[in-house]
Amino acid sequence: MDTKAFKRSLHKSEQYHRKGFGHEEEVTNLLQSEYNSKLIQQIRNNGYRLQQGDVTIHLAEAFGFCWGVERAIALAYETRRQFPQERIWITNEIIHNPSVNKNLRDMKVEFIPVQPDGQKDFTVVGQNDVVILPAFGASVQEMQLLHDKGCTIMDTTCPWVSKVWTSVEKHKKGSYTSIIHGKYKHEETIATSSFAGTYLVLLNLEEAEYVADYILNPGDTPSEREQRRADFMAKFANAHSPGFDPETDLERVGIANQTTMLKGETEQIGKLFERTVMRKYGPAQVNEHFLSFNTICDATQERQDAIFQLVDEPLDLMVVIGGFNSSNTTHLQEISIDKNIPSYHIDSVDRIGPGNRVEHKPLNADLTVTDNWLPNGPLAIGVTSGASTPDKVVSDIVEKIFSIKSASAEVVGVR
């Protein structure tokens, strides 16, 4: 499919929208009342620190809602106001935050049902319905299906995600295989790969090193090459385009990324493949075999930079707040753990209690319960949150921490 031509056609359709409907002031006021926090603003104004009793909160200087998330939520709220009686669907969670998605459900925004085989059931969508595409975007196949149905589409895709789509389309035009640094099951990567031609999704630097080694050492004999190819295909069974052949499709590669991945790792992967093609084809041929554009999201970079700064503080523990399926939140937790700071990833204040107990998600593990997670005595606690987390959620958790440590330290009347 010529995805670029399809996007141009879709954007010209009267049924397609990616801007608001004139309800900005009303929606802005509503979002501020639902998601903002006077306490968090107070902490910002106080140099990102607040002490109550023997607890000092150190807040990251960049955290919480990014511009793309705020925009997506605002457009979803505007859509409901513009179409008060119509049936409204959304193809996925608008963002990875349970409270925001619950609010949309309360507004009678329905989620496209998922069948037992994992495929979405779009037969429920009627011609007169409205469908919201979330901040992560949607695959080009889903967009075409909805366009063909003739339903109204509100596209809240983050512009940074759209920028990555443009990059992989350039890879496709130049006959480069898109090496996508991301999680192959993540909604954003699914959407991005649908705009690519030939692609391979790599989770981390370790997988990238495996691929780089294959490029340089595919095997010396036919049997070795056959075995190495079979091992490669088994390792990346669910992470490549149909018909992908590592023997031919890794001769020309372009780098792209899921916007929420670790910035430093994406850069390392890009440099690794640049060095790899230089070794294989020579310095003069690098541009014939390697292509890279800067597709690292500013907001992701800012939040990662802020927690790198925060973990240099003498902290006793870190609280990382965000949806458990939020990629950018998970990476914030990784940074804290790499600094050997005890880290608790929670998605809401309801995970805390009763008493000095917390239900949290360790990195790459299931939910677990830890008792006495807040030690006695003075505590310096780092707090950050993913790009999909409202200030109000952070505020509730900070207040809960204060109340556990000392009843006299409860923050009264500041919200």
Curated annotation (Swiss-Prot):
Cofactor(s), by name: [4Fe-4S] cluster
Biological process per Gene Ontology, one example term: terpenoid biosynthetic process
Superkingdom as given in the UniProt entry: Bacteria
Pathway involvement of the protein, from the record: Isoprenoid biosynthesis; dimethylallyl diphosphate biosynthesis; dimethylallyl diphosphate from (2E)-4-hydroxy-3-methylbutenyl diphosphate: step 1/1; Isoprenoid biosynthesis; isopentenyl diphosphate biosynthesis via DXP pathway; isopentenyl diphosphate from 1-deoxy-D-xylulose 5-phosphate: step 6/6
Enzyme class: oxidoreductase
EC number(s) from the headed UniProt entry: 1.17.7.4
Free-text cofactor note: Binds 1 [4Fe-4S] cluster per subunit.
Residues involved in isopentenyl diphosphate binding: H96, H186, S326, S327, N328, S388
GO MF annotation, one: 4 iron, 4 sulfur cluster binding
Binding-site residues for [4Fe-4S] cluster, renumbered to this chain: C66, C158, C297
Entry binding sites for dimethylallyl diphosphate: H96, H186, S326, S327, N328, S388
InterPro entries attached to this UniProt entry: LytB/IspH
Annotated residues for binding of (2E)-4-hydroxy-3-methylbut-2-enyl diphosphate: H96, H186, T259, S326, S327, N328, S388
Pfam family, one: LYTB
Active site: E188 (proton donor)
Reaction catalysis annotation: isopentenyl diphosphate + 2 oxidized [2Fe-2S]-[ferredoxin] + H2O = (2E)-4-hydroxy-3-methylbut-2-enyl diphosphate + 2 reduced [2Fe-2S]-[ferredoxin] + 2 H(+); dimethylallyl diphosphate + 2 oxidized [2Fe-2S]-[ferredoxin] + H2O = (2E)-4-hydroxy-3-methylbut-2-enyl diphosphate + 2 reduced [2Fe-2S]-[ferredoxin] + 2 H(+)
Keywords: 4Fe-4S, Iron, Iron-sulfur, Isoprene biosynthesis, Metal-binding, Oxidoreductase
Gene3D superfamilies, per the entry: 3.40.50.11270, 4-hydroxy-3-methylbut-2-enyl diphosphate reductase, catalytic domain
HAMAP family from the UniProt entry: IspH
Family: Belongs to the IspH family.
Known role: Catalyzes the conversion of 1-hydroxy-2-methyl-2-(E)-butenyl 4-diphosphate (HMBPP) into a mixture of isopentenyl diphosphate (IPP) and dimethylallyl diphosphate (DMAPP). Acts in the terminal step of the DOXP/MEP pathway for isoprenoid precursor biosynthesis.
Protein name: 4-hydroxy-3-methylbut-2-enyl diphosphate reductase
Organism encoding this protein: Acaryochloris marina (strain MBIC 11017)
Gene: ispH
